[in-house]
């Protein structure tokens, strides 16, 4: 298809049309009294949501020009969603309005360079004004208020999120998952940890809408080595495939033949697998892998110092967890094995002794980071309801409220 160049009044008209579509579809969801929107799906029931980002992504005008303009606005919402996790409705409305007003000014004969400079100056003025208004959110009541507003005025959601923040701390790990029960919202505190490493290939993703890897009851293979070839882990891959359970590989790196074979197995459906890099560097990586091994009940962290080889590992020697959640940036392990609590506490006590005996401020800081990850645990918000549509709508609001709360307490 040949490219079409559009300028002048035709372009301005298309911009106005897209802005009006966004105002009608997205603008109505804004604020604590915002309305919900039903999004038609090619299969299954429609999705009911108040999430501006989901609404924006669903807007696909048939006109190619209108679609291109809508995609530009959606990109700004996407960046806002990635960086903050909330505020996408406000971001989209502002972006659409800026584009509309710039189009009007240009049509009236204003110089486009002057318009751009004016927009940038206005942005700085607005940011300065907002920074002067900000204040810290400290109390549990204030946290609940922030979450309640973002959850469309649902006080129960606000109170539960504030409870989670108080339990695991403002830097603690809080996740949201669907419950099989009818109870609208429940909180469960469990062992677990999160580290700053994401999946090594987007092909590992199991939830394409949110670009997540989500595993239930997975096996976990830990190694300090770099995996370049598939041969050393073939026996364990075959055993895991026969078990029907997913596998998470945490290694120094996974690349080349090893990575491509894992991706191929995942795409063919032969094995639910994902791979991430181990957190930390050098000796700190060794220590953090040891922490993960204690938490998950893994008997070995495969390394050059260990007599046992990867080919000889059995399923009983691998780690396990209740759930694994992996984004492009983070890995969250939720729920330790049943008999690991005593071992985790022993590890925590060991780290505390190391902190007291260390003379290096840097080492103390890193030890405290490990202590926080291991002892903080994970708070799980379980969302239930009487129907799938109800659960998904409530889960969207809980996730939005959680993102808003995190942004407020940072």
UniProtKB/Swiss-Prot annotation:
ATP binds at residues 29-32, 50, 86-90. One of its GO terms (molecular function) is ATP binding. It comes from the Bacteria. Its EC number is 5.6.1.7. Keywords: ATP-binding, Chaperone, Cytoplasm, Isomerase, Nucleotide-binding. The keyword ATP-binding applies. GO terms for biological process: protein refolding. SUPFAM superfamilies: GroEL apical domain-like (SSF52029), GroEL equatorial domain-like (SSF48592). Gene3D superfamilies: GroEL, GroEL-like equatorial domain, TCP-1-like chaperonin intermediate domain. InterPro entries: Cpn60/GroEL, Cpn60/GroEL/TCP-1, GroEL-like_apical_dom_sf, GROEL-like_equatorial_sf, TCP-1-like_intermed_sf. It is an enzyme of class 5 (isomerase). It is found in: Cytoplasm. One of its GO terms (cellular component) is cytoplasm. It catalyses: ATP + H2O + a folded polypeptide = ADP + phosphate + an unfolded polypeptide. Belongs to the chaperonin (HSP60) family. Together with its co-chaperonin GroES, plays an essential role in assisting protein folding. The GroEL-GroES system forms a nano-cage that allows encapsulation of the non-native substrate proteins and provides a physical environment optimized to promote and accelerate protein folding. Forms a cylinder of 14 subunits composed of two heptameric rings stacked back-to-back. Interacts with the co-chaperonin GroES. This is Chaperonin GroEL. It comes from Ehrlichia canis.
